[in-house]
């Protein structure tokens, strides 16, 4: 994935400066690739160290839920901005094979492994109190 010009904090840096907004839940809506717009908000909330006691996500918003809860601002950006350039992401090739336009197995299973295109930090996710 491409590096973004702005430095995003590591999950550890983000957790160290976390501010929790009590009595408020954060819900990420679905919307497929429209969530590329929301990715900037997710990254900014993480960079500012803002946390919520409850976080939920629906459909594509569940990707934001995972990235926000694991405090991975860079992954939040890459999931909806850079990943679309990956040939395995989807397209007509996958659609013609009867798998749908998006390669869901790749997007939601394969990329998150430690050696995948966008490794997921499960330890940071599980350590988040939300």
Where are the language model's segments positioned?
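A generic local structural motif
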Residues: 12-14, 42-43, 118-121
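Structural motif
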Residues: 16-18, 47, 124-125
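Patatin-like phospholipase
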Residues: 23-24, 32-115
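A short alpha-helix-loop-beta-strand transition element characteristic
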Residues: 114-129
């Amino acid at each position: 994935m491409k590096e973004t010009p702005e430095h995003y904090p590591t999950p550890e840096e983000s957790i160290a400066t976390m501010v929790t907004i009590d009595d408020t839940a954060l819900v990420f809506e679905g919307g497929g690739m429209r969530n590329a717009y929301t990715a900037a908000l997710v990254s900014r909330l993480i960079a500012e160290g803002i946390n919520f006691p409850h976080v939920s996500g629906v459909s594509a918003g569940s990707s934001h839920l995972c990235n926000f809860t694991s405090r991975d601002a860079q992954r939040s950006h890459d999931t909806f901005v850079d990943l679309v350039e990956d040939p395995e992401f989807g397209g007509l090739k996958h659609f013609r094979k009867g798998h749908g336009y998006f390669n869901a197995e790749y997007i939601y299973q394969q990329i998150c492994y430690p050696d995948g295109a966008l490794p997921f930090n499960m330890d940071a996710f599980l350590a988040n109190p939300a």
